Every structure is written in structure tokens, then in C-alpha cells.
Amino acid sequence: MDGTEGSVGQPGPTERSHRSSVSSVGARAADVLVYLADDTVVPLAVENLPSLRAHELHCAVREVLKLPDIALDVFALWLVSPLLEVQLKPKNQPYKLGRQWPELLLRFTSAPDDDVAMDEPFLQFRRNVFFPKGRELQIPDEEVLRLLYEEAKGNVLAARYLCDVEDCEALGALVCRVQLVTYQPDWPAACDLREKLDSFLPAHLCKRGQGLFAALRGRGARAGPGEQSLLNAYRKVQEVSSDGGCEAALGTHYRAYLLKCHKLPFYGCAFFHGEVDKPAQGFLHRGGRKSVSVAISLEGVHVVDSREKHVLLGLCFQELSWDHTSPEEEEPILWLEFDRDSGVTPVNKLLKIYSKQAELMSSLIEYCI
């Protein structure tokens, strides 16, 4: 599609329903707002906004943030709304694409007409889906690392990057180390963590207890299981980061967080929305469909059950063949063909993903291969 790098998908943790990236427009000048992953706003005064290209805005953001040249490869400009995400090519004109947003929603989403009419995208400066994650840890600039860290943290907290409990606690401990003071055995950290737990752990791991026991626990009481596990993980991080009494630089903790995220299969992915057939249940019951997220990176494809938040399928590109079809008057389909070991001989499998973004997913897979 003209206007994207194939990385169009469902919105992530930074989605906002009442944002706009054009705060005012004069005869020649305009105030453009570009959002960072941590919700910081970068205001830009630009001229000839309708003809301005993404590359020019990208350079302006880098200049304001005083980022090194490597940021040109690491980050990209995205148009983001609650309904759709689009990574822009350098030659794209963001203002023009913003005006075409309803057409993009109709083409690539199944959103109701009322939602399409109300939706408005904003500009975001965030990770380029085509930047190899192996190069990140070689970056010396602390501000670049911080921006990558903030984006990864947001994806973990929003459960977009699925993690087991142990990984979530280890990542949460690194966030504690960045945000809070040095751990001390007599520090009343349980209270502090209890109040800020959703800043360190995904929502499903930090739901506060309900009822009488929660009321009796009080602010000065002992930490609950989630808080205590996070405290224990935080203490381990502190012990590792202290070297002869000298605290490690923030860049070290950013790298540690990113390195941990690199082990997650979803890091650096573009996310798409689709549906797959449910297995038929019983003689008279039709299977129906279930909603899925399709995560595509430079390394492979993962299909995630959107409701249950678990991985249905994970494949490296060497393990699959793919195609997409767009039958007339039917939903486009992305086909994934792969082998699975049945215990004796490999069995050929075929997964059918119904999605208006099938063509985009196919194009991204082709690019990555």
C-alpha cells in the first residue's frame, strides 16, 4: 500500500482516542505534536505542512531530542489511533495520510462506521519494525536506549509482549531499579510498590486483593505475594548492579531490560488483527471463529489468542510457506503452511487467517524473508 512499509496493524499500549498531532494551522506555519512512547510530547513549528514528508519531520524530532544519526535507522514515524497503526515511509506525507485516514480504516479494518467517523490518528516517534534487535545493544547513546526501553516497557505492561510470571517480575524489578531508590532491608518498599504496582507489572499480575483481608492489611502491613516477589527480584537486581558501592549507570539497566525483552518472541513485531476458525466441538456444534493477533518480526510469525492471551502458533520463516488470497465478496485470507511432528512422521498443516490486513501481512513476510 502506498503510505506504509507493510506494518499496518492493531493498536498497542500507546493508543489514545482524543489526540491530535496538528494543534494549530496558520497561513503558512503549523504546530505539529509528535508523541513519544512515554507520552512525552515533542512540539514542532513547521511550514508547508501538507507537503512535508515523514523524513523531514523525523529529522526535526531528532534535532529537538539531540539524538545521534543512528536514530534515523532505529526509529520511524507512525500514524496511530485506537483502530489502526501505520509505519510511515520516509517519502510519505503525514498530513495527506491523516486526511485519508477514513479510507484506510475502511480498507484495513472492520470498524463500524460511527467509530471510523470519530477516529483521529496522531504521530508517534517509535521503534522501526525493520531495525534488527541485535544492533540495539551496540548503541552507546543513553537517550536512544531510554526511548527503546520506554516503548518495550509499555508493551510489557499492556501484555502485548506476553511473558511468564518470572519474566514479568524480573522486568518489573529492572523498572523499579530505574525509577526508585536503592533497596534497603528496612525500606518500607511494600507500601510504595503497592501504590505503584501497575507501573511495574502487567494488570493481570497486580490486581489488588478485595474484601476483608485487603482492608485489614493496611499501608503498613507486610507485602502481598505479588509485591513480595517483586521486592525479591528487585533485591537481586540491586545486588548485581552494585559493584564495590558504585551504582551502575541507567544505560546499563536499559540494556538489561532490552536484552531480557529480546528473548521474547514478540519484541520488535508489527501486530495485525485477524480471526481463525475454532475447532468443531461435537456433532451439532459449529466451531465459529476466535480473534487473534498476528505478530510478525524479522525472525518469524506468531499467532496469539487475543482473548486468552496465549500463543497458538510460533514459526520461524524457514518453517513456513505462505500466501494470501482475496476472493470476491469474501474476506481476504492469509494462509500459513507448515509441518508438525505427529510422533511418527511430520504432518502438513494449513492455518487460515481471515483478515482485511492479509495483503499487508503477506508483504511484510516477503520483505523479512
Curated annotation (Swiss-Prot):
Q: Which domain of life is it from?
A: Eukaryota
Query: Under the cellular component aspect of Gene Ontology, which terms does the record hold?
Result: cytoskeleton; plasma membrane
The region called Disordered is annotated at 1-23
Pfam families of this UniProt entry? FERM_M (PF00373), KRIT1_FRMD8_FERM_C (PF24522)
Q: Which Gene Ontology biological process is one annotated for this entry?
A: negative regulation of canonical Wnt signaling pathway
- Report TM segments: none
Q: Where is the FERM domain?
A: 30-369
What is the protein name for this chain? Putative FERM domain-containing protein FRMD8P1
Origin organism of this chain? Homo sapiens
